[in-house]
């Protein structure tokens, strides 16, 4: 028989190169020659019909039979059949209008015999024995877009394993199996009456084409691993290609709707997809039985059910269907055994679960090693405190590489041994994981699901211990995540690491197996919901599995949250779905499935809530609400009935809080009135305390004892409180750091003689000669100041002597102008003109300097009283206050009427004006040293010392004062004669010891005259403070040190206190001094000691001493330690004592330094201490 086909590649008769398209012809010429013996040859009509069908488009009948689980012993070739549609296979169910074909024994069908003949010839041509054909798993590969797919054929357990499993069935399962067998026998009897040989041939032929296409797709992914296999006829490739093109168009139309529904209601998607898998599981065993018995009468009923819900399935979930292929007789093709629906479901379940486990376990015959294997392709994410596992999207190369690894014949036997245990364990793991997976569920459903999971866990601990080693966590769903990483997780901890070797084997068998398992639980719940109480627990585990494994991910990628699970043996409740699988007949199961589908499609969440609440007979643990209610002394029994598990936490908590008895509150009118009175009393007390704090009467301090208001403040204190405050009060302000100062300036008298508005250059009697002078004289008062500050006067008198009236006007304006900037600018102009006038060497006239009267008039106009300017009676100037006023009035006589009522020009201390006057005086005393007489210099020195006592000048560095004092002391002609007079005059400027110390420290000590004045002034002040007679101050330093030793002995604090007490008693009429006055006198005594010690330091440390004075300093050190240091008794409450003792230590250190720097006397190497005589 001649066959027309394309020539095969040399060297590779049947297998194309990897990556190439499958050849048009799948059988070589003469390929059947080796297998012709005992085989029936094909007729030319059959071959012609096959060629015609090759170029025809695939019919609907071909498409809906692609997933048919028909048995086939043919090995197909081909390579990488790409599916670019929805990445899956979906059945197109047959129309319910088709008549049921008559069942005919398969061995009598001519088409099947011709097809089987060609296949056997094809296998014998390549020398591959049928027994060595790999057993393909019952699973489908869920692929990413654009990847390849293979649809492996099915396998079933050996007869021995099946009989072994039947031995362990419970009585309930045997009973259900018996009912199923009876129902199936009735279906077969009804099917015989509707037989039609012509329709039977059509249906059988369509089944063969569908099964061939599925097997072809499965073998195409295995072509790279089995290059010796030859391809089959191109008819089945064309059918599969046309199916894929149609699925591509359908996917594009449904993609947007599926993504929106998937993102909005993932729970509904999961539920609907589980229902879809349930329909497939219900349909596939019946297809197997129809293949064995040719026709099953109940086919149209199941097709009606599937067609009725097909549109709703597609709208609520992504189009992913786990496909199953093959039958139980895949390994034994010569045996055709008729089984009941329950037997087929049982065998399919037993053969599927081990293969699902084999996808994440290494294929080893040794059982113990399988426990330590792990799931792969899991990506870890931690969005919260829950571990999140996601499946990484597979690469196209990974799909085909993992196909051959999971198809070894030995896997069937190894996996079948653990089928029942693995099924239950996967249900338990899926139940716990799914309840943590759905974050969109209501809070009540999440809590109920968690409680049910704990109940299942408790029930598992009571079952057999043979299954307690491992609870394998199945791979849940593939999530395309490019950035995910592989995470190893042990099965016992729900940790599922993978080796890199098994990276390509992930989701094909697991997704299909667990989805089908979930469907079986759902069917069982629909059939035996009211009969068996254990079914509800199976419902609980099956429902989450449906939503967990049946949720496909496109966009956004679905994620799985996994909580650590504890391995425990499977509970009997987990076996309930499998044990009750055979109960009921097929018609009753079909009607129950319809009702269940309708109920689930109406409301998925209500269905889940009903499933969770249906477990009433199961032993339950204490709920969280019951434990929390114990805090309120309340139990669920007290409320009448426990809250339903489906209610949320809010409703449960509100139920329990409603039974808590509130406390009794007696709010009477008397209590309200009492509270108001207490509030008013507290408000008044708070106001009183705030007022006392504001007035400084918050704490009664003994510091103010002796003051006028101290007695009033302490009248309200008890005696014991007074004693307590007096005992523990701390006095820290007895010795201030700064001198108290005096009020020298009276700002109300400022501007009494003149101000910036009355000073006019035109009233000075000046007659202008130059153009600039005439311009200034023609200008007003404001313009005169402007021209002066802009440099007109400086340029006018650059080469000419400046007239005295102009200089005097500038000096007065500088001292009285309220704008400090203008005052500084006038000072600059005045100093520049004065310096320029001094450069004229040919001029016989000295530059102008202000006279003592001009200086006194300026300070008097600032607000200083005339008696303060010249405080000493024996040192008075030649003028008086009236002269200053009259002189100024003559210069401003014309404007006196206009400014008869003057106002103070200064409200604060004019420190800028004061310093400007002092600076100009310093310049004048430097340029013209002989400008002042000695008497005038002494009056100026006393004036400066008095002005420095101003309180507001304490914080201002008086460097300009010291500079002027140096010039004035330098200009004194008879210095030695004037020093004692100057010291006695300064000593009279103040009566306060600290002010006098300030005057001593104001004297500059960096000149010889300054140090001398400082020493003499210190001795004079010390003698005054110690009430000694004023003696002539010796000029020699040796005599001064000797006098100092005599004064130092009298500086004992106790002696000073006695003198003060005696003086105070003399002033008191009764001569009695209380303790408070004694404390004040003690403070004054230590304060005086502090000042005296500073003055002693100024006397001794002002300049360097010779070796002849060394013995005097040795005496001073001994007197200081003996009379002062030893007399001070420090106290923590009396800080002033510590302050005085610290000063004693510093002075002693300085004297020791002077002693060390002085050389010993002539002829002595060492100094020895000589006791006082």
Swiss-Prot record:
An example Gene Ontology molecular-function term: ubiquitin protein ligase binding
Compositional bias of kind Polar residues: 317-330, 409-428
Residue ranges crossing the lipid bilayer per the database entry: none
Compartments reported by the entry: Nucleus; Nucleus, PML body
Top-level division of the source organism's lineage: Eukaryota
Chief location category: nucleus
Region feature (Disordered): 1-109, 161-230, 256-275, 280-373, 394-620, 635-663
Annotated motif APIM motif, positions: 137-149
Tissue specificity as recorded in UniProt: Widely expressed. Expressed at higher level in skeletal muscle and at slightly lower level in brain, liver and heart, than in lung, kidney, spleen and thymus.
InterPro entries on file: CANIN_dom, FAM178
Keywords (A to Z) from UniProt: Disease variant, DNA damage, DNA repair, Nucleus, Phosphoprotein
Coiled coil: none
Residue segments, region Required for interaction with SLF1 and RAD18: 702-1173
UniProt region (Interaction with SIMC1), positions on chain: 635-1173
Effect on the protein upon substituting residue 271 to C: Found in a patient with neurodevelopmental disorder with hypotonia, dysmorphic facies and skin abnormalities; uncertain significance
Modified residues (Phosphoserine): 481, 603, 607, 614
GO biological-process terms attached to the record: chromatin looping; DNA damage response; double-strand break repair via homologous recombination; positive regulation of double-strand break repair; positive regulation of maintenance of mitotic sister chromatid cohesion; positive regulation of protein-containing complex assembly; protein localization to site of double-strand break; protein sumoylation
Biased composition (Basic and acidic residues): 39-50, 88-106, 181-199, 280-293, 339-349, 355-373, 499-520
Family of this protein: Belongs to the FAM178 family.
Record text on subunit structure and interactions: Forms a heterodimer with SIMC1. Interacts with SLF1 (via N-terminus); this interaction links RAD18 to the SMC5-SMC6 complex. Interacts with RAD18; this interaction is increased in a SLF1-dependent manner. Interacts with SMC5 and SMC6.
Biological role: Plays a role in the DNA damage response (DDR) pathway by regulating postreplication repair of UV-damaged DNA and genomic stability maintenance. The SLF1-SLF2 complex acts to link RAD18 with the SMC5-SMC6 complex at replication-coupled interstrand cross-links (ICL) and DNA double-strand breaks (DSBs) sites on chromatin during DNA repair in response to stalled replication forks. Promotes the recruitment of the SMC5-SMC6 complex to DNA lesions. Plays a role in SMC5-SMC6 complex recruitment for viral restriction.
Protein name: SMC5-SMC6 complex localization factor protein 2
Source species: Homo sapiens (Human)
């Amino acid at each position: 028989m001649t066959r027309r086909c394309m020539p095969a590649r040399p060297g590779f008769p049947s297998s194309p190169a990897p990556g190439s398209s499958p050849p048009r012809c799948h059988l070589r010429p003469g390929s059947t020659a080796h297998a012709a013996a005992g085989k029936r040859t094909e007729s030319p009509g059959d071959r012609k019909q096959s060629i015609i069908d090759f170029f025809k488009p695939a019919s609907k009948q071909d498409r809906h039979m692609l997933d048919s689980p028909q048995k086939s012993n043919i090995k197909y070739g081909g390579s990488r059949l790409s599916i670019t549609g929805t990445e899956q296979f979906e059945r197109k169910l047959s129309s319910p209008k088709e008549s049921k074909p008559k069942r005919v024994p398969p061995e009598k069908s001519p088409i099947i015999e011709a097809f089987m003949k060609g296949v056997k010839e094809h296998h014998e041509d390549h020398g591959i024995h049928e027994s060595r054909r790999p057993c393909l798993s019952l699973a489908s590969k869920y692929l990413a877009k654009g990847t390849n797919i293979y649809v492996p054929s099915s396998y079933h357990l050996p007869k021995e394993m099946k009989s072994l499993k039947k031995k362990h069935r419970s009585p309930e399962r045997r009973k259900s199996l018996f009912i199923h067998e009876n129902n199936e026998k009735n279906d077969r009897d009804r099917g015989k009456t509707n037989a039609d040989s012509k329709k039977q041939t059509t249906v059988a032929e369509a089944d063969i084409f569908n099964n061939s296409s599925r097997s072809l797709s499965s073998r195409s992914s295995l072509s790279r691993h089995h290059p010796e296999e030859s391809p089959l006829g191109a008819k089945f490739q064309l059918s599969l290609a046309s199916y894929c093109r149609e699925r591509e168009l359908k996917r594009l139309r449904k993609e947007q709707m599926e993504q929106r529904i998937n993102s909005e209601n993932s729970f509904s998607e999961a539920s609907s997809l589980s229902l879809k898998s349930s329909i497939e599981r219900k349909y596939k065993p019946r297809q197997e039985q129809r293949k064995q018995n040719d026709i099953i009468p109940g086919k149209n009923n199941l097709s009606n059910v599937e067609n009725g819900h097909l549109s709703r399935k597609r709208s609520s979930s992504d189009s992913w269907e786990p496909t199953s292929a093959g039958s139980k007789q895949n390994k034994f093709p010569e045996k055709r055994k008729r089984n009941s629906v329950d037997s087929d479901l049982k065998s399919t379940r037993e053969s599927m679960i081990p293969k699902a486990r084999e996808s994440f376990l290494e294929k080893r015959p040794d059982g113990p090693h399988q426990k330590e294997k792990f799931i792969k392709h899991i990506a870890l994410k931690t969005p919260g405190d829950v571990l999140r596992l996601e499946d990484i999207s597979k690469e196209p190369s990974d799909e085909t590489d993992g196909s051959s690894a999971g198809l070894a014949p030995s896997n069937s036997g190894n996996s079948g041994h653990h089928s029942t245990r693995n099924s239950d364990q996967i249900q338990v793991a899926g139940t716990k994981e799914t309840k943590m997976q759905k974050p969109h569920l209501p809070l009540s459903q999440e809590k109920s699901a968690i409680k049910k999971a704990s109940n299942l866990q408790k029930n598992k601990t009571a079952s057999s211990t043979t299954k307690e080693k491992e609870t394998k966590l199945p791979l849940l769903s593939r999530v395309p995540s490019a950035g995910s990483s592989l995470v190893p997780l042990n099965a016992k901890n729900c940790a599922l690491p993978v080796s890199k070797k098994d990276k390509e084997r992930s989701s094909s068998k697991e997704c299909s197996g667990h989805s089908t398992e979930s469907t079986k639980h759902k069917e069982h719940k629909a059939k035996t919901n009211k009969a068996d109480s254990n079914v509800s627990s199976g419902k609980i585990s099956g429902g989450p599995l449906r939503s967990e494994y049946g949720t496909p991910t496109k966009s956004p990628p679905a994620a799985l949250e996994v909580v650590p699970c504890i391995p425990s043996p499977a509970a009997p409740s987990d076996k309930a779905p499998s044990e009750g699988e055979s109960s009921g007949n097929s018609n009753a199961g079909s009607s129950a499935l319809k009702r269940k589908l309708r109920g689930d499609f109406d409301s998925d969440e209500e269905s889940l809530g009903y499933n969770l609440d249906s477990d009433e007979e199961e032993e339950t643990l204490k709920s969280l609400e019951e434990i929390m209610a114990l805090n309120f002394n309340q139990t669920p029994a007290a409320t009448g009935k426990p809250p339903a598990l489906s209610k949320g936490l809010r409703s449960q908590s509100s139920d329990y809080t409603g039974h808590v008895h509130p406390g009794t509150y007696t709010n009477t009118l008397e209590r309200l009135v009492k509270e108001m009175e207490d509030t008013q009393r507290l408000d008044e007390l708070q106001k009183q305390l705030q007022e006392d704090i504001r007035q400084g009467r918050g704490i009664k301090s003994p510091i103010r004892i002796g003051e006028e208001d101290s007695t009033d403040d302490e009248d309200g204190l008890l005696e014991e409180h007074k004693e307590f405050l007096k005992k523990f009060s701390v006095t820290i302000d007895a010795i201030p750091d700064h001198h108290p100062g005096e009020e020298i300036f009276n700002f109300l008298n400022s501007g009494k003689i003149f101000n910036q508005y009355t000073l006019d250059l035109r009233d000075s009697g000046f007659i202008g000669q130059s153009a600039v002078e005439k311009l200034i004289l023609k200008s007003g008062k404001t313009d005169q100041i402007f021209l002066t500050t802009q440099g007109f006067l400086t340029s006018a008198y650059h080469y000419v002597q400046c007239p005295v009236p102009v200089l005097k006007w500038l000096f007065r304006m500088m001292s009285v102008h309220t704008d400090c900037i203008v005052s500084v600018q006038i000072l600059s102009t005045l100093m520049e003109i004065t310096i320029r006038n001094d450069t004229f060497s040919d001029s016989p006239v000295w530059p102008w300097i202000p006279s003592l009267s001009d200086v006194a008039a300026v300070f008097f106009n600032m607000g200083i009283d005339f008696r303060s300017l010249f405080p000493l009676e024996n040192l008075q100037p030649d003028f008086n206050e009236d002269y200053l006023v009259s002189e100024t009035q003559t210069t401003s006589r014309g404007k006196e009427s206009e400014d008869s009522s003057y106002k103070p020009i200064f409200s604060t201390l004019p420190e800028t004006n004061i310093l400007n006057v002092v600076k100009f005086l310093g310049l004048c005393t430097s340029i013209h040293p002989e400008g002042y007489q000695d008497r005038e210099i002494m009056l100026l020195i006393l004036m400066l010392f008095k002005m420095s006592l101003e309180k507001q000048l304490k914080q201002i560095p008086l460097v300009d004062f010291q500079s002027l004092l140096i010039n004035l002391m330098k200009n004194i002609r008879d210095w030695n004669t004037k020093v004692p007079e100057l010291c006695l005059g300064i000593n009279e400027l103040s009566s306060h010891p600290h002010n006098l110390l300030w005057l001593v420290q104001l004297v500059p000590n960096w000149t010889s005259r300054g140090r001398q004045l400082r020493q003499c002034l210190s001795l004079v002040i010390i003698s005054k403070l110690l009430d000694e007679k004023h003696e002539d101050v010796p000029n020699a330093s040796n005599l001064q040190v000797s006098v100092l030793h005599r004064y130092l002995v009298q500086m004992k604090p106790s002696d000073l206190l006695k003198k003060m007490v005696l003086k105070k008693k003399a002033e008191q009429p009764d001569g009695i001094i209380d303790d408070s006055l004694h404390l004040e006198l003690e403070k004054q005594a230590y304060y005086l000691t502090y000042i005296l010690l500073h003055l002693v330091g100024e006397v001794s440390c002002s300049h360097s001493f010779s070796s002849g004075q060394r013995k005097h300093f040795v005496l001073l050190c001994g007197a200081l330690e003996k009379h002062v240091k030893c007399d001070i008794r420090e106290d923590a409450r009396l800080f002033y004592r510590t302050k005085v003792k610290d000063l004693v230590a510093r002075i002693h250190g300085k004297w020791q330094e002077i002693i060390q720097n002085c050389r010993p006397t002539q002829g002595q190497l060492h100094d020895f201490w000589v006791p006082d005589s």
